[in-house]
Swiss-Prot record:
This is GTP cyclohydrolase 1. Toroid-shaped homodecamer, composed of two pentamers of five dimers. Belongs to the GTP cyclohydrolase I family. It comes from Fusobacterium nucleatum subsp. nucleatum (strain ATCC 25586 / DSM 15643 / BCRC 10681 / CIP 101130 / JCM 8532 / KCTC 2640 / LMG 13131 / VPI 4355). It comes from the Bacteria. GO terms for biological process: one-carbon metabolic process; tetrahydrobiopterin biosynthetic process; tetrahydrofolate biosynthetic process.
Length: 187
């Protein structure tokens, strides 16, 4: 895959940010920081150019329509509003329709979608959308709980605040018992 990220441009931009901060006492120690930031952005944002549909091509046939849940999957991302990290856990429950992903593939989906400038609400919706569309499952319910450093470090500065977002597709939109089953298992 061709790398589209312009590391040199990122490096130059962060050099300008450091200069714009004013007379920073430790300028000598900061001289390699722009390059380190550019290098770290390659890793942090590697999901930008990856289409999840191209990666999630392997499914397994099943003869079950029972709930499948994978929970407490850690992730981190960067808030697109402030370019500060947010991190937390994802829980995914779905009812298959003859095919499933391997558990590692679900982790891969979360990784790809979170490794880009992101909003938690969009991340939650995208995870649900891709699982629902690719698997053509009966329904999917996604819960994302995260701590945002933009809330902790700036503005209101509330250290213990966590944001919870959900997305429901298919049977989870219409069958309150199915949704209740997931919420009970989350406790």
């Amino acid at each position: 895959m061709e790398e589209k990220m312009d590391s040199k441009r990122i490096e130059n931009a962060f050099f300008e940010v450091i200069e714009a901060l004013g007379d920073v006492e430790y300028k000598e120690e900061l001289k390699d920081t722009p390059k380190r930031i550019a290098d770290s952005y390659k890793e942090i944002f590697y999901g930008i150019d990856i289409d999840p549909k191209e990666v999630l091509t392997k499914t397994f046939e099943v003869n079950s329509n029972e709930l499948i849940m994978e929970k407490n999957m850690d992730f981190y991302s960067m808030c697109e509003h402030h370019f500060l990290p947010f991190f937390g856990t994802v829980c995914i429950a779905y009812v298959p329709n003859k095919k499933i992903f391997g558990f590692g593939d679900i982790l891969k989906l979360i990784e790809i979608l979170s490794r880009r400038p992101q909003l938690q609400e969009r991340l939650t919706e995208e995870i649900a959308k891709y699982i629902y569309e690719i698997l053509n499952c009966q329904g999917v319910y996604v819960v994302v709980e995260a701590k945002h450093l933009c809330v902790t470090m700036r503005g209101q500065k509330k250290e213990n605040t966590k944001i919870l977002t959900t997305s429901a597709k298919g049977v989870f939109e219409t069958d309150s018992n199915k949704k209740l089953e997931v919420l009970t298992l989350l406790k």
